[in-house]
Amino acid sequence: MAKSPETELPLKAFGWAARDTSGTLSPFHFSRRENGDDDVSVKILYCGVCHSDLHTLKNDWGFTTYPVVPGHEIVGVVTKVGINVKKFRVGDNVGVGVIVESCQTCENCNQDLEQYCPKPVFTYNSPYKGTRTYGGYSDFVVVHQRYVVQFPDNLPLDAGAPLLCAGITVYSPMKYYGMTEPGKHLGVAGLGGLGHVAIKFGKAFGLKVTVISTSPNKETEAIDKLGADSFLVSKDPEKMKAAMGTMDYIIDTISAAHSLMPLLGLLKLNGKLVTVGLPSKPLELSVFPLVAGRKLIGGSNIGGMKETQEMLDFCGKHNITADIELIKMHEINTAMERLHKADVKYRFVIDVANSFSSL
């Protein structure tokens, strides 16, 4: 007879879980492992709400196992360390992102590319040693030290939480594909959780940044608040035509199905388009503009642990955080409804510790 999530491991834990494809979250008692020799135990203070949390809750990608406790933008304080842990101490502010385990022996792991390990264990909804992982919509987590990162002292913990997914998701491809040369022109397609952080990275790298959006009412915010240099309404044919061949790079953060062809037209010769938005349906693409303009389309999946630490340190140096709306856990279902409607500027973050302190 299978054990229940509440009793299968030694440590009692509490969070909010969805039980079915309605995606509705409610209180959930489960259990976590004891802190091992290489582990770090973290009391969760804040957890960002990622669009992939919503996809997983609804089983949009077809691999959700219920009950599921989402959350992979975790910031908290260390409460216990194993005897082999030298990098972290009790009381440190730390982060836990999208992955909590990998094989640690393959070529990718040996190159600090754990996110491309063929056997990754994600922070939630992954099988792991006979049980499943549960994420950061909960009171604490136990993680192998390799998958924990130090949080810079000058970054606010709540507004820094989304950097652990949204931040590294745009930082890693910008670095890998060389989209960092000062003075070059970066297009940011989509102004949401990923896009607004991409603007900030672009400006920190010294790029000219243009936001590409279907929503003209976002222009003032993009330029005056987030620091973009210009704004391009993608459903305005005349403005799109005038902007053709003007951009060196585009990072496409759009999570809805859309055609890549208009974006390719904006690129110069040798331009690079990198997509990170994970639409649930295939995107329209013709190879002709790639061949004719020697253009590149690429993708990227979060970042390895070494690069995630590098990204956080970069954010600390340049005072980069996410723009957030702080919520309590009991508000999470309303937040998910709003996220589905893109009604957030620009990332929800759950005040986990204060949500559970009265329980």
UniProtKB/Swiss-Prot annotation:
One of its GO terms (biological process) is lignin biosynthetic process. Its EC number is 1.1.1.255. The keyword NAD applies. Zn(2+) 2 binds at C103, C106, C109, C117. Pfam families: ADH_N (PF08240), ADH_zinc_N (PF00107). It catalyses: D-mannitol + NAD(+) = D-mannose + NADH + H(+). Keywords: Metal-binding, NAD, Oxidoreductase, Zinc. Binds 2 Zn(2+) ions per subunit. GO terms for molecular function: mannitol dehydrogenase activity; zinc ion binding. Its cofactor is Zn(2+). CDD domains: CAD1 (cd05283). Zn(2+) 1 binds at C50, H72, C165. InterPro entries: ADH-like_C, ADH-like_N, ADH_Zn_CS, CAD-like, GroES-like_sf, NAD(P)-bd_dom_sf, PKS_ER. Belongs to the zinc-containing alcohol dehydrogenase family. Oxidizes mannitol to mannose. Provides the initial step by which translocated mannitol is committed to central metabolism and, by regulating mannitol pool size, is important in regulating salt tolerance at the cellular level. This is Probable mannitol dehydrogenase. It comes from Medicago sativa (Alfalfa).
